[in-house]
Curated annotation (Swiss-Prot):
Pfam family of the protein (one): UPF0180
Disulfide bonds: none
Source species of the chain: Bacillus pumilus (strain SAFR-032)
InterPro entries: UPF0180 (IPR005370)
HAMAP family per record: UPF0180
Family: Belongs to the UPF0180 family.
Protein name, UniProt field: UPF0180 protein BPUM_1317
């Protein structure tokens, strides 16, 4: 199952992704950055949760300016 990490402030996105059948976890710390296939972040802070120097092979989607539906469509495209 595809695992999606989301920032805690994106609860609407979290719920919509769960409804679509994704395994969704809230990103709480740097250690979780290697546990997901895709991440959704707010983009309000370039140092997301203090992990600006973390690298990941997973897709990172910046949610700024997007609706929950648009974010879900972007997730679906990136995890195919």
């Amino acid at each position: 199952m595809t695992r999606i990490g989301v920032e805690p402030s994106l609860s609407d996105v979290e719920e919509l992704l769960k409804q679509k059948g994704y395994d969704v976890v809230r990103i709480q710390n740097e250690q979780q950055m290697d546990q997901c296939d895709c991440y959704v972040v707010t983009g309000l802070d370039s140092n997301v949760l203090g992990i600006s120097d973390t690298t990941t092979k997973a897709s990172v989607i910046t949610a700024s300016g997007m609706t929950a539906d648009e974010i879900c469509q972007e997730v679906e495209q990136r995890v195919q």
